[in-house]
Amino acid sequence: MSLRICVGGATGWTGKALVAGIVAAPDLSLSGAVARKAAGQDAGIVAGLDVLGIGVAASVEQALSAEPTDVYIDYTHPSAVKANVLKALEMGVPAVVGTSGLAAAEYEEIAKFAEKQGLGVVASGNFSITASLLTRFSLLAAQHVADYEIIDYAKSTKPDVPSGTARELAERMGAIQKSVPGYPIKDIIGPHEARGADVGGGRVHAVRLPSYVLAVEAIFGKDGERLTIRHDAGTSAGPYVAGTLLAARRVVALKGLVRGLDNLLFGTLPA
């Protein structure tokens, strides 16, 4: 039997590509779609496909009540994702979270509720396989180099700062060891904002300009040497679809929260 998936944010860039990817996969089927502004329309038409006979719902509760669903995937908006995922878990459906912008405290709340429900959640700021390698390499580097900063690049219209990729990376690197500025931020002469934001114990700088899709750069420095690890995303949603659907296939066997596609692929990094 195919894995039945409901997509939240079905009218978005990744959401449309996910609908197409699910329809094309022999082991998956689309059970529902959520997009408030497109409610009532056919999910296939919204995604640029032929008619699928599946209506777009206005809410997660409406979509999951309409058809049996094995996995809920969320690519909605930072303001909606936590409530969406908690609702899915409440209704007995594990979740995959690709929406960026959640804070560490929100992930903690989701993790606790997932454990309580005995269900799995996989959340990643970036579901690209190569981005997960950036994360893993950077976490390994953070174990050995205490001085680091992150630069986050995205299009000028991206609403959340930093991106989910950069935020997740900074928080996870900070959990290994925090990067203490060589000169105290409070004593800086000039605008303190020029040194970036403190995210998870490290400095993060966000660049928002036309021509960028998404790029993240982790820079590590020691006396006399420097290491730069960088990932650049292209204009195709394909890499995110592949990683998201990989997570959807695996989340049904999990309990609790797995944060970061790298942990799903390579296992938890030893302390």
Residue ranges and their predicted role:
Residues 69, 93-94, 115-122, 223-231:
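Glycine/charged-rich beta-loop-alpha catalytic/anionic-binding loops adjacent to active sites
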Residues 61-62, 67-90, 102-106:
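Beta-loop-alpha module in the N-terminal Rossmann-like domain of NAD(P)-dependent dehydrogenases
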Residues 6-8, 13-66, 146-271:
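C-terminal substrate-binding/catalytic lobe of Rossmann-fold NAD(P)-dependent oxidoreductases
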Residues 1-5:
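Extreme N-terminal starter segment of soluble prokaryotic enzymes
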Residues 8, 75-76, 98-99, 124, ...:
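Structural motif
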Residues 83-86, 91, 99-121, 137-140:
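Rossmann-fold NAD(P)-binding glycine/threonine-rich loop
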Residues 31, 57, 96, 120-122:
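Structural detector of well-ordered beta-strand residues that form the stable sheet scaffold
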Residues 132-145, 161:
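Rossmann-like NAD(P)H-binding beta-loop-alpha module
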